[in-house]
Structure formats: C-alpha cells, structure tokens
Amino acid sequence: MPRAPTSAIKKQPLTFAQLAAYDDILTDALIDHVYYWTAIPKNRPLYHPSRGIREEEITKIIQTHLIVDPDLAIAEEKLLATDGLRKFHNSLRTDKEKEDFKAHLRRYISIYLPDCPFEVNATNRFTIDSYEASITARRPIRRNEAIKYLAGTQVTVTPEEEAQLALRKKDFSLVVSSRSKLTSLFMGPARFANHDCAANARLVTRGSAGIEIFACRDIGLGEEITVTYSESYFGENNCDCLCQTCEDNVANGWKPKDGTVPVHRSIEESVLGDDQGYSLRRRRRERSVSVAGSRTSSVTPDIRPRIFKTAKNRAMASDRASTTDSDGIDVVAMAVAAPKRNFDTTALSSPPLTPAKRQKPNHYDVVPLPLGLDVSRDSSASGPVDSLIATEDEKSTATQATTPEFEEPKPPSMREKPLLSPEMSPMKEGATPVGALNGERDEPTETGAPLSVLPTTETDLPEETLDIAATTPSLFPSSECSMTANDLPEHITPVSEPPRLTQEGKSVARQDSQETIIEESLAVPNSAPSQIQEAENNAQQGAETPVLGASSLTAEPHNEVAPVISAVSTKKKKRRVSEKPAPEPVRKQRVPGDYTLTPLLLAQPETAWIHCTNCNTAFVQSDAYYTRANCSRCERHSKLYGYVWPKTAPAGKNDREERVLDHRLINRFLHPDDEAIIRGRKPWRERLGQSSSSLAPSEERGRQRESGTPQGTPGDNYRRSGRARRASAKAMAQ
C-alpha cells in the first residue's frame, strides 16, 4: 500500500526582510496617511513612499467601512484595490507571501474599529527634537485584560542582523525572550508600545510567531500603555532609560551627574507664595479659558503659555512653575536651552563692503613670503613702476560700473606701495620657496609641481605685454611677471649668486642646450628685517595662508629679459595627522520634563506651545498666528470619528450628539474673543465699549419717519414716507 501523505506541512516562517517590507508599506499607508502629524520610523534604511497612496482615498475607506459601518472584509478589499497597495500585493510571488501580507494588513486596519481601546499617539520623551509613536488608552482597561487589537507578529533576528539594526539605529522593536534568551523583532500595532521599567502591560507570545499584550494593572483613560523590553535594553541595568518611571524617580537616564536631586515646590507654596504679588511688568490675566476655570495661573496653565528663551527670564519665571500636568516644565526648559549668542560689535564699526567701495586691483592684503632673501618692499615700488601702476589704477577705477564718482588721485607719497607679484598661491608648512632655489630641477619639488620657465629672449615676450602683465595682474590668469634690469632702481643692483651644492656635492643649477636659468637675489636695506621676521613667524604656524607667488627679479649679464620661475602646486601635500583616539561623544544631561514647554522647539517664528482645550496636553503649533483649539491627537480623532476625543460611536439610540464626519465643517481655531483673552488683550466688543448682548441696532438708511406720522398706502393722499402727496404745478396747468 502506498504511504499516506502527511496531514499538514509545517508553514515556513516569515523572514526579517519580508516582515520589514510588509510593515514599512502598511505603516506608511495606514498610519502616516491617515491624518497623522508625524511619520513612523521605517525598518529599511531607504524607503520611498508609494505615489499611489493618497490620504483622501485611504481615510475615506477607513471612515466608511471601519468606523461608520465596520466590515473588515470590505475594507480589506477596498484598500487592496488602491494603486499603492495593489502594486505591492501583485509584486509578491507566492500565495504564502500574499496571505501573510493580508494578515498583517488586517492587524493594522483593526485599530480603527470603534471598540478598539487604544489609539496611536506620538511622544518626544526619548528624543526632544523628533517624535516617536506611542499607545494611549482611550477607555479604562482592567487588570489582566487582553488589550484588544494590540497584537503583532515576531521574527527571530540573528546577531549579524541585530548589529546592522543597531548600526542604523533601527533597533526600536527588539525584545529578548525570558525563556529562550533569543532576540526577536516584533511588528504590527504592538510595536508602538514603548518601554517602561514599571510597565502597566506585558508581552505574551501566542503560537509560533504571534504576540499579544495584557494589562498588568488597571490602566486609566489617557494613560500610555507600556511594556518592558528587557532588563538591560538601555545599557547595563537600563542605566540610560528615559521612561516615565525613571523620570518620576529621577533615576537612570534622568539622574544628575553630581547626584543632587531637584526639590519640587509644593502647591501651597506656589499658590500662596510671593509669586502672586503685584508686578508692574506682568499683565494680570483675569480671564482664563482653561478647562478647570481657575483664575490662579500657577495652578492651571494658560492655553498659550509664555515660554522664555533667555536664561535671565527663565530664572525669574522658575518660581512660578506650574504644578499641573506640566509640573516644573518651565524650570526644565532652562537646563536645555543654549545661552544667548554674543554678537561681535567690531564688525559694525565700519560699513559693510559694497560694490561702490570695492577694493582696487592694486591693493592687496598679502602676507610676505619668507624667501630667505633680503627683499625690500619699499624698493620694489619705486621709480617708473610706481607711476605705471598709478596710471593703470586710475583707468581701472574709472571703468568700474558700480563706482558712483571718481576719486581724486593721491600724490605719490600718499599711495600705497604695490607689490610686483600679486599672484596668490597657497603656502603650506614644509614647502620650499622658489626664491631659495638657485637653479632648475627636472624632478618635481617637494610639493610635486615642476618649475615653469619663461623664454629668455626679448622677442618671445614683447615689452608691451610686460607692462600690462606687471600692472594689471588680475586681468590675466598667467602668474609670470617680469621686468628688465634697466627698470630697476638705482640703489638696487643685480647680484649673481653661485649655485648651491647638494649633499652629494653636485650643483643644483644645470646647463641646458636651449635655456640657461640663473636665479638672482636682491639686497635688502636694514629697514626690512622686522617684516621678514614677522613673515617667517606667520609661515611657521602650520595654517594654509594665501601668499604671493614665488617669483623673483632676475637679470643676466647682457641686460636681457630674465625669466621668472613660478612654482604652482598641482597636488596638495597631505598633512600628517597623528592618529589619536576619537573622544567619546558627551551625553547630554537630561532634566525631567525637558521635552515639553521647551524653547528648543520654538526655533521658527510664530511657533508656540499650546495647551489643548480638550485634554490639556501641551503641543507645539507652527505658524501660530491663530491658536488651535485642540492638539494633533484630538484633532485627528475628531476628523476620523466625528466626535470629540475619546468618543468613537454613539452611546445609544437616545444619543442626540451630532456626528460631523466632514472635518471641513469644523472650525479648528479658538474664538476671536478667546484668542484675545489668552494673549492678554480685551475682546474687541469690550474695546469698543459694547457688550455682545446689548448691541445698538443698526440705523436704517434714509430719512426717518416721525412718530405718529401715518404710513402711506396706495390710493390715499400720503406718500410711503408719510409726507402729504401734492399735485405738481405742471399737472394742474394742463
């Protein structure tokens, strides 16, 4: 007899790559594109949102088939028919992959059912400047109750994959099993539950890869649902943990480095203390739109609190810290805010550089090159060269298009002494100046650049070109600049220097068959040593400083034009940096409550911290020209369910509350009167001296009829205005 086939084949478990791909596209489509005010972190390093996922289409399906008329099968079919999810579903090869994707889809769409006891929220507790997902209860949950729809699936992660996730900082959903001690990555709505050292819920494994969450104690309305990841998830013994429990106990990541624990002021001290005294500089807000309706600003915070950005103002406001849900938040903001920047007032002593005050071509703020030669700056700017440059300076000044008027030419004694070689080239530490060389090498220099040589005959370089090149070097890219020996001043004479010898005893200068290069040096008067010494000190600082090109005046015995040797670095010399261990990044000291009502999130103009009028939660509103009435969580809930948070469905047949499913019909901002009150102003009706209940009726246009005057009717002798009807003289004449 043939062997009977096995009853069932073991299903192949999901891999990490498959589960990460499913979760990324589903969180993008069903969370980020459903009125969510931030974005869920993705598992893959590069994730590009699908263009076929449109917010209006997704939210309409969820509202119609999951909230108003719940039906998971129809909602799943409608969502898979959208462009983005349909393309991804069709790209899956096997039926097993498609079924796994649909099962993961059903986990996410179930969180929008009216009987779901939680809602996806966001928090910036762990990173102040960015938000992460969290889970908030929207109805009371009893102890040992399975939190409905807060489930997921898990996959075992290898140590190599765990290291890659930690390197990319994507290890936010890793848990360690208490039995097998294996690391697993869990996905689905359960991944949004954050860690807490004294969590109110626990993770329970169901089946081979399922995860459910049970309540460990009673969870109240609006409380965050948390679980415990592991004993050493945030460092050894969770020494870097930033959960709510550690914040309340000022432990682990919230523990101060010096060991001092801040003391919170009592309610009686803050209410009855001297902070309630009269102040001329503080406007008393007698009206408050807070939920509790209390007139004491220290007990119930204002809807739009004033956040001080300077350390001085924050120190003055520290004694008036609030003792409600935002306890000590004003005190917290002081520790994390950067000090005020000191502006440099020296930059304002002179007007800024404008096109009309552009620097002249012959004015250069140049550091002299330490050539090792005695070169005088004063001697190089005298004689016919001075007059030639001065003439060219006047021409260049007159041709500037942005110059409003001509400047009067200065006498020669008042003009600045120009340099003959204004070509700029980088100078590095250890580079040998060309002026110190006495010959030409075929090999490259220390900087790796060969020496460039000009022709030695007068016919190769006309005199006209020499004059233009010497006077207007900024108009030509060439760095060579030369002059004849006849143009030298009388007190400067060409001096020949014998070629130096290398260590092998060979001459540096070489005789070529076509060209002969002899480098000359100039004598320097006694007035220049201080300038040369200062330049040498600047060159030894190791910083890369733009200096003049290493070109020198040369001459030959027969008064021919001497070539100029210019060393241009083509390759930058790599600096030798000592390999020192990189210093460890200094961990910023966290202070309890520093993530809310902090000035760090108010960098943009017209950005303000607002207290929600529904749940009293503080949130940041950008472009707060008009104050929003609700936080992002309450506003998202109202758009989806049509009710104020946390209501999701009608209470019964006798529920008469109107359900507004079109969110465009709801005004999301405060009333103008409330807006004026929270900003410390009087409502406009009071400013005009009128109340909203007793407004004067608007006067009718035209002449008013006196009392007792009969109103005219058709056919009588009275007009409609009440005046007597008289016949015209023209009609009577006829």
From Swiss-Prot:
GO terms for cellular component: chromosome; nucleus. Residues 116-230 form the SET domain. One of its GO terms (biological process) is methylation. Its EC number is 2.1.1.372. Residues 527-543 have a biased composition (Polar residues). It is an enzyme of class 2 (transferase). Residues 343-459, 523-543, 567-591, 681-734 are annotated as: Disordered. It is found in: Nucleus; Chromosome. Residues 407-418, 578-587 have a biased composition (Basic and acidic residues). It comes from the Eukaryota. Keywords: Chromatin regulator, Chromosome, Methyltransferase, Nucleus, S-adenosyl-L-methionine, Transferase. The keyword Nucleus applies. One of its GO terms (molecular function) is histone H4K20 trimethyltransferase activity. The keyword Amino-acid biosynthesis does not apply. Pfam families: SET. It catalyses: L-lysyl(20)-[histone H4] + 3 S-adenosyl-L-methionine = N(6),N(6),N(6)-trimethyl-L-lysyl(20)-[histone H4] + 3 S-adenosyl-L-homocysteine + 3 H(+). Belongs to the class V-like SAM-binding methyltransferase superfamily. Histone-lysine methyltransferase family. Suvar4-20 subfamily. PANTHER family: HISTONE-LYSINE N-METHYLTRANSFERASE KMT5B, SUPPRESSOR OF VARIEGATION 4-20-RELATED. Histone methyltransferase that trimethylates 'Lys-20' of histone H4 to form H4K20me3. This is Histone-lysine N-methyltransferase SET9. It comes from Chaetomium globosum (strain ATCC 6205 / CBS 148.51 / DSM 1962 / NBRC 6347 / NRRL 1970). The gene is SET9.
